[in-house]
């Protein structure tokens, strides 16, 4: 039986994850026409997890989520996604591509929000168990450049809570992701997301060829 493969995409706001996941999905379907390719996002995926996503992404005037509430909501979404979506797909031998996963929780709620990293890892472990990525593609871009992209692609009123954080928050996010990549070099591949779209895509394909036996 074909072994499933789990790839996650990480990075700061405006790094181009959505575009690159779409391009990778198209490339995999072309090269592996008989292989199931499953694409989803975190938070989100199954219907219940999508409802949690709406709470996390939409501002609540006068009652902003405290960091621990964010952490627990992300964990609830991940638990639902792992059991309803990712684990069954991997058992079927699918290639699973997810836009953000637990690394984002550790970086956003830990490095940027200031929660204890060990507490975050314990919560993530409870939520996800043995479901862990085989490869994480970290799309790295300077925060000011990524935020400029988000302003270009969407009106100011369409930005979510994380887009509108201060620049210092996004700088902490980038630092957190790069530290995570340094600590996990076998799993995390750093991609230069400041390059043009096709160059970024080729970097991703090369990282997959080097680290996984699927292409």
Model regions and ranges:
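A glycine- and Lys/Arg-enriched "phosphate-lid" helix/loop adjacent to the NTP-binding pocket
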Residues: 105-175
């Amino acid at each position: 039986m074909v072994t499933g493969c789990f790839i996650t995409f990480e990075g700061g706001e405006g790094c181009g994850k959505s575009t690159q996941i779409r391009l990778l999905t198209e490339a995999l379907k072309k090269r592996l026409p008989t292989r199931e390719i499953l694409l989803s996002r975190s938070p989100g995926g199954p219907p219940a997890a999508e409802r949690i996503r709406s709470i996390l992404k939409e501002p609540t005037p006068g009652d902003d989520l405290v960091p621990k509430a964010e952490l627990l909501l992300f964990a609830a979404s991940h638990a639902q996604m792992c059991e309803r979506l990712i684990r069954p797909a991997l058992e079927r031998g699918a290639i699973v591509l997810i836009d953000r996963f637990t690394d984002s929780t550790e970086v956003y709620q830990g490095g940027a929000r200031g929660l204890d990293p060990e507490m975050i890892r314990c919560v993530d472990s409870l939520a996800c168990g043995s479901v862990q990525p085989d490869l994480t593609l970290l799309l790295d871009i300077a925060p000011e450049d990524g935020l400029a992209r988000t302003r270009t692609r969407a009106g100011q009123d369409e930005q979510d809570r994380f887009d509108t954080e201060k620049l210092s928050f996004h700088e902490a996010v980038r630092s957190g992701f790069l530290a995570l990549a340094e600590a996990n070099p076998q799993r995390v591949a750093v991609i230069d997301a400041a390059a043009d779209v096709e160059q970024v895509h080729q970097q991703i394909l090369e990282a997959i060829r080097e680290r996984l036996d699927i292409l």
